[in-house]
A protein has these predicted regions:
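Glycine-rich, aromatic-lined ligand/substrate-binding cores of catalytic
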Residues: 253-409
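Second-shell loop/turn segments in exported
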Residues: 137-141, 149-158
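Substrate-recognition/cap regions that form aromatic- and gly/pro-loop-enriched pockets
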Residues: 360-494
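Sec/Tat signal peptide C-region and signal peptidase I cleavage site
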Residues: 22-26
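Histidine-centered catalytic/metal-binding microenvironments
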Residues: 474-543
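A contiguous strand-loop segment
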Residues: 28-146, 167-322
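Bacterial N-terminal signal peptides that target proteins for export
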Residues: 2-10
Length: 543
């Protein structure tokens, strides 16, 4: 009997572990980026919108690299390790120089971070990792281009989104693409594109005469929105439709050579099912499901069983604004079937107060439980757009009726978009506070703005039910004030610009600078106050 019980117990444990692995725990280890974009006719004011959340431990220092002129014969260095290039970084990849390429005569000012965001011409870029099939893994002995280095070169050299794509595509082909499959959303004030690039296998060498990368870009229709949550988005390609597609010459040949596509099969060549990592888990699709359900519910029902066949883009039910994208970045799927806070494990019997004896939701219930909490309570976390492991995020506007110094703006923040603030950074800006340009993740550092936002987010996630409402009391009015002032600030900048563009840029620089200083100090104050409120000699909950 004891042996039977032991065998039964082992069987139950084995099945439980298996189900948890398949259903949920694995999801929490997926890439967690999400990019959302909108064409100019899909927005309330004609803006072109792009965005990104950067998950994981990446360099979140916002560094402005000024425009520069270069003498003939100047060479530009090519680096590996830019995404974790902060001087003080745990387990950081060393910054390694892989080679040099000829520099151009003039490079534009860019806003550099792990994955560089924008230039002073109004080209704005978001990144999301796609992964790739094993067959097209790169030859790191000969290929030297990583996606973040390509972004730097593209932003320094391009005046339009289309030009950016052509520049980095050519560089990846010539010098070899060494990174994983990557996706970019690339915008200017007129259009937005989805760009995807993959390595061409471990046998590539520059001497082969073949392209060292395979890539494709598709234009998002002007009246559509699209989202890329760490998964390839492009379906079939028409290389003759140059208005809507830009592709490498080997976009299909590389797949045939690598054994990823058989033209004799009579099957259509589907880009997204060919090069991208098809083992991506359900969490990536869940974010797409949420975006389409929010922005285009009437085009549904968006069935979960059909999640791998969602379209490249969709026309939203109503025109969207940058505020809608920010709301999605802060969405925690509350009230949906994927609401992580509604797992029954979070409910406990109250021991005191007006609800004594009743089952109440614990203040520990959080949309983003840690892996330890998932294990302890036998629950699992479903991916959401916001993320406790995020490094930075932005939502951008590009507007063709304003000078690019004013019309290009990205609403930027550090750590988790749900608990953080979105500060407007104009592409004409020339400076940010020093605390936003330094980062030491090896120790707690009050000299770094990132730590203020990360510390508050950590507190919120540990006692979400108790602290999140207190954060909202401060965050929501502060964010709404920034929204309300945007039009008047930009009108004042426009007046200045007509007489002296430099004075307009200084005005916007000073405005953003003051907002960054203010929000950082507010968050340091929140951190200290939350320490007091959750001290175990002070806090008394009802259970």
């Amino acid at each position: 009997m004891k042996i039977k019980k032991l065998i039964l117990g082992i069987a139950i444990i084995s099945v439980t572990v298996m189900l948890l692995s398949v259903s949920g725990f694995a999801d929490s280890t997926e890439d967690g980026c999400i990019d959302i974009m909108a064409g100019k006719n899909a927005t309330v004011d004609g803006s072109v919108l792009t965005s990104q959340t950067c998950d994981g431990g990446y360099d979140s220092r916002l560094i402005i690299i000024p425009a520069a002129d270069h003498k003939p014969g100047t060479m530009a260095p090519v680096y590996k390790g830019i995404i974790r290039a902060a001087p003080e970084f745990p387990n950081r990849d060393p910054l390694v120089k892989l080679g040099e390429i000829p520099e151009v005569a003039h490079t534009y000012k860019i806003f550099k971070i792990a994955y560089p965001i924008a230039n002073d011409q109004g080209v704005i870029v978001g990144e999301t990792t796609l992964g790739n099939e094993t067959e097209c893994s790169s030859n790191k002995d000969t290929a030297i281009m990583y996606i973040e280095q390509l972004q730097i070169f593209g932003l320094q050299r391009a005046k339009t989104a289309r030009e950016f794509i052509e520049i980095i595509g050519e560089l990846a082909e010539k010098w070899g693409y060494a990174d994983r499959g990557e996706g970019l959303n690339v915008s200017d004030a007129n259009e937005v594109w989805v760009f995807e690039v993959y390595p061409v296998g471990p046998l590539w060498t520059p001497e082969s005469g073949k392209p060292g990368a395979v890539w494709a870009a598709q234009r998002v229709p002007d009246d559509h929105v699209a989202t890329v949550p760490n998964k390839s988005l492009i379906w079939e390609i028409d290389p003759n439709d140059t208005k809507n597609f830009i592709v490498s010459s080997n976009y299909k040949d590389a797949a045939i050579e690598l054994g990823l596509y058989d033209p004799a099969s009579d099957e259509p060549f589907i880009w997204r099912f060919t090069y991208s990592d098809r083992r991506k888990k359900a969490g990536t699709d869940r974010r797409t499901w949420r975006v389409y359900n929010i922005l285009a519910p009437s085009a549904g029902p968006w069935l979960w069983t059909e999640r791998s066949h969602y379209p490249f883009s969709i026309k939203p039910d109503k025109k969207v604004s940058y505020k809608d994208f920010i709301a999605i970045f802060q969405d925690e799927m509350i009230g949906t079937e994927y609401d992580n806070t509604e797992d029954q494990a979070w409910y406990v019997k109250a021991r005191r107060g007006e609800h004594a004896g009743e089952m109440v939701k614990s203040s520990l219930a959080t949309p983003e439980p840690s892996r330890e909490m998932q294990t302890l309570l036998n629950i699992y976390s479903l991916d959401i757009a916001s993320g406790k492991g995020c490094s930075y995020y932005f939502v951008s506007q590009a507007r063709d009726w304003l000078p690019w110094e004013i019309g290009g703006v990205f609403w930027f923040g550090l750590d988790n978009p749900k608990t953080g603030v979105f500060v407007p950074v104009y592409v004409g800006n020339n400076e940010v506070p020093e605390s936003w340009t330094v980062l030491d993740r090896t120790k707690f550092d009050r000299k770094s703005a990132w730590w203020a936002f990360a510390a508050v987010d950590d507190q919120i996630n540990r006692l979400h039910g108790f602290l999140n409402p207190k954060l909202d009391e401060v965050l929501i009015p502060m964010q709404e004030e920034m929204y309300a002032k945007q039009e008047s600030i930009e009108q004042e900048a426009l007046k200045l610009y007509k007489n002296d563009p430099e004075s307009a840029k200084k005005f916007l620089t000073d405005y953003t600078y003051s907002l960054m200083e203010k929000t950082e100090q507010v968050y340091w104050g929140l951190f200290e106050n939350f320490l007091f409120e959750t001290n175990n000699n002070h806090l008394r909950l009802y259970y």
